[in-house]
């Protein structure tokens, strides 16, 4: 054993057969097991355990020297590896060291042979793999259509991805995968190809990836891992039967003999206690986790009645654990989840990490269904109230609670699995999600999958560029679907009228969404869906999508700013107890199938007297006001209102505008920030500058000359000045000289007049979640309609 003693150290430590260097601190309070990439990390953990057994009061650290550690198996820590509150076990990088824990294996000594069409091949022995890197760069598994990072979803899709004419070219498609969005764009579906049938058609396995009875899209799909589709530079294919690895380099370049890394592991560190022996007091810090295999074919566990299927694994997994700290790490190039906090966990802190370029979710707090009373596992399932367990709250402690995700930078996630989130919470209690920056995600930035058991705090986050590859969702999304919930709304009204206590059997504590900045250009900024209940939403700056409240009970929404958008109330129940007060909205409400309007909708600021009048016509907003909010400096992200703003007269108060998102200087320097929208404001007659919308250049009809030229019976509507080629407006056959009179909603019977360009822009913003919008237009002195597909 190599024994490093600091000055004045007199006590000797003899540990037989230990090969790693052990440094003993001078005060006798700490010992460090120093490891390098050539050491066996599992043996290092054994040495740390021996040190702890020798002196349980001593702090133990496993300290990694700089380098890449290619693990052959995950590092699994159990209750025996626990530290104490005063002296936790630490897994950490040496000061200033760049330490990478990799789940990949190096492929060395490769002998490449030219094959055909610019493709080379080499033999690779060992287990199969589904991820391949060259010099740290992820390569593309052979696919159709070819990968283009600028195209969404999936880097490109094609309706003919699995057409019979294409399939006929495939000699051995077994092992291939069809990736598709669901037809309603609620998430992704993966379908394994098992081979060909007697008729030459594909034999397919079961669809994986989403907890709803849905069909895959006919058009938004691609196929991968098919040899015959290997036709682009940097594509590869591995034949697991013959062990040939095929690769297409740049033309005229032969592949290198080294520098290739194949995926091997799905997990890198697992903190695994048991119900009888929890692991506790462990810190993981300063490490980089990368190069893990995909897990999408294992994403098969339904998370109650949410839309999610889930895989309980990630680069770091914590289960049956207490007082765990995961801090200042980097997670990138992962095939699945980054951090999964599964089952019983208490006082887990996830702070200061950067998570990006991964296949699934960033951070997930997910309890076990055995902790849930009367659990159901699919949207359409229901149960009679007579059979419900009426005891409130959980029935066991197999769930995460009293934990925090704070100051994390999470971006470019969900590369493979589109039903994913920056932070996911399901079957958990009292989780705090604070000061995180989350952006460039395919679906929600933050998702709460069910009502069990509330008490969460979502605060000070910066969440934007969300719902980029799916639809009908938000930067923040939640479902309720608690034990009493039914998809039959009339049945729900009957149940709650008979026993109002049902609504808080699972959602036993209020969830707070406070002081966040959110922007969703393809859905809602905050989306409380399907029975989400017991929420307080206050002091949020919402930059694009507004707030949707569907079904549910006891939602208090107050003192929020909805830039260029509004409240979207959908199918509220009788006696819902909902409150919407002291908010700034910038267009009229967008109700759908509303027969009941909650406890109080009042004291709000509308942009125009017309919008306020529409609200009052429905029986709400008796004390609300209309007028410009008078934001101080929107271009510089300051949407505080001026001292003379009418917002102050309805009880709105300003909140801070400069402390959203990550706090750490390093992460703050790396984090992007959302683009600030220009508020839609009507200009004085004759003073309006043209603006851009959906590829059109538009302005309000505001002069007699414009009215006369277009043949309008009155001075109203929005004049189309120009249409950009290949834009959404161009595809809808809108033309220069058209006048847009109103937005028509075929499905729900709502429509909005668009007398000005500002009204058109705001009304369009309120409908982005639908994916299309129908305009009533005036062309050659006749009315017609145009359907525009929204980007």
Which functions belong to the PLM regions below?
Residues 14-25:
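Bacterial N-terminal signal peptides
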Residues 32-330, 371-395, 637-638, 648-682:
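Extracellular polysaccharide-degrading/modifying enzymes targeting complex plant/algal/animal polysaccharides
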Residues 63, 70, 76, 90-92, ...:
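Extracellular beta-strand solenoid repeats
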Residues 73-74, 293-299, 335-341, 359-366, ...:
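Short glycine/acidic-rich loop motifs that flank beta-strands on beta-rich extracellular proteins
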Residues 280-291, 322-336, 346-360, 372-391, ...:
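Right-handed parallel beta-helix
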Residues 676-718, 722-725, 774-776, 785-791:
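PDZ/PDZ-like peptide-tail recognition elements
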Residues 684-693, 700-704, 723-728, 733-756:
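Short glycine/proline-centered loop/turn elements that form peptide/ligand docking sites
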Residues 732-735, 741-742, 755-791:
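PDZ-domain C-terminal substructure recognizer with occasional recognition of PDZ-binding tails
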């Amino acid at each position: 054993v190599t024994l490093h003693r600091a000055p004045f150290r007199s006590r000797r430590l003899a540990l037989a057969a230990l090969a790693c260097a052990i440094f003993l601190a001078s005060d006798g309070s700490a010992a460090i097991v120093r490891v390098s990439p050539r050491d066996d990390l599992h043996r290092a953990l054994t040495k740390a355990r021996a040190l702890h057994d020798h002196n349980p009061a001593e702090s133990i650290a496993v300290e990694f020297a700089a380098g890449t550690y290619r693990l052959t198996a995950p590092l699994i820590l159990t209750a025996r590896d626990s530290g104490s509150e005063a002296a936790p076990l630490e897994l950490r990088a040496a000061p200033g060291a760049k330490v990478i824990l990799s789940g990949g294996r190096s492929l060395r000594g490769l002998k490449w042979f030219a094959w055909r069409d610019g493709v080379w091949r080499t033999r690779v022995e060992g287990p199969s793999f589904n991820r391949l890197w060259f010099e740290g760069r992820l390569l593309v598994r052979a696919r159709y259509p070819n990968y283009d990072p600028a195209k969404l979803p999936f880097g490109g899709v094609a309706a003919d991805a699995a057409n019979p004419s294409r399939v006929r070219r495939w000699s051995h498609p077994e092992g291939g995968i069809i990736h598709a969005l669901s037809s309603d764009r609620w998430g992704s579906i993966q379908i394994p190809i098992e081979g060909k049938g007697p008729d030459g058609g594909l034999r397919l396995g079961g669809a994986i990836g989403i907890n709803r009875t849905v069909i895959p899209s006919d058009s938004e799909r691609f196929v991968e891992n098919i040899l015959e589709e290997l036709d682009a530079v940097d594509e590869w294919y591995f034949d697991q039967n013959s062990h040939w690895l095929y690769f297409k380099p740049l033309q005229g370049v032969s592949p290198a003999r080294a520098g290739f890394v194949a995926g091997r592991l799905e997990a890198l560190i697992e903190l695994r206690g048991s119900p009888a022996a929890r692991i506790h007091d462990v810190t993981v810090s300063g490490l980089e986790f990368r190069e893990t295999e995909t897990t999408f074919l294992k994403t098969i566990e339904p998370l109650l009645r949410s839309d999610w299927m889930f895989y309980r694994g990630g680069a770091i997994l914590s289960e049956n654990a207490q007082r765990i700290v995961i801090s200042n790490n980097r997670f990138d190039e992962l095939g699945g989840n980054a951090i999964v906090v599964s089952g019983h966990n208490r006082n887990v802190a996830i702070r200061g990490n950067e998570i990006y370029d991964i296949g699934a979710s960033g951070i997930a707090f997910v309890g076990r269904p055995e902790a849930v009373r009367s659990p159901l596992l699919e949207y359409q399932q229901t149960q009679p109230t007579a059979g419900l367990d009426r005891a409130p709250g959980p029935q066991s402690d197999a769930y995460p609670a009293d934990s925090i995700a704070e100051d994390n930078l999470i971006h470019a996630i969900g590369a493979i699995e589109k039903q994913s989130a920056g932070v996911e919470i399901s079957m958990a209690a009292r989780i705090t999600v604070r000061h995180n920056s989350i952006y460039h995600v395919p679906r929600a930035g933050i998702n709460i999958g069910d009502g069990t058991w509330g008490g969460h705090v979502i605060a000070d986050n910066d969440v934007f560029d969300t719902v980029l590859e799916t639809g009908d969702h938000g930067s923040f999304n939640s479902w309720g679907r608690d034990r009493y919930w039914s998809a039959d709304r009339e049945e729900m009204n009957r149940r709650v009228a008979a026993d109002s206590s049902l609504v808080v059997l699972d959602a036993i504590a209020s969830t707070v969404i406070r002081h966040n900045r959110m922007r969703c250009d393809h859905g809602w900024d905050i989306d409380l869906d399907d029975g989400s209940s017991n929420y307080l939403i206050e002091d949020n700056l919402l930059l694009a999508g507004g707030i949707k409240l569907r079904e549910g009970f006891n939602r208090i929404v107050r003192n929020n700013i909805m830039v260029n958008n509004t409240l979207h109330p959908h199918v509220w129940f009788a006696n819902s107890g909902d409150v919407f007060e002291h908010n700034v909205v910038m267009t009229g409400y967008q109700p759908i199938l509303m027969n009941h309007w909650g406890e109080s909708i009042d004291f709000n600021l509308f942009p125009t007297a017309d919008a306020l009048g529409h609200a009052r016509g429905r029986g709400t907003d008796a004390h609300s006001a209309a007028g410009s909010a008078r934001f101080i400096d929107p271009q510089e992200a300051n949407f505080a209102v001026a001292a003379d703003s009418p917002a102050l007269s309805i009880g709105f108060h300003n909140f801070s505008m400069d402390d959203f998102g990550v706090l750490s200087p390093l992460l703050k320097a790396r984090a992007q920030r959302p683009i600030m929208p220009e508020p839609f404001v009507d200009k004085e007659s004759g003073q309006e500058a043209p603006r851009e919308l959906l590829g059109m250049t538009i302005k309000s009809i505001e002069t007699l000359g414009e009215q006369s030229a277009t043949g309008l019976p009155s001075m109203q509507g929005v004049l189309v000045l120009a249409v950009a080629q290949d834009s959404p407006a161009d595809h809808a056959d809108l033309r220069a000289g058209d006048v847009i009179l109103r937005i028509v909603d075929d499905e729900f019977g709502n429509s909005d007049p668009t007398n000005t360009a500002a009204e058109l822009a705001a009304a369009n913003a309120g409908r982005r979640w639908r994916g299309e919008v129908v305009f009533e237009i005036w062309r050659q002195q006749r009315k017609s309609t145009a359907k525009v597909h929204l980007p």
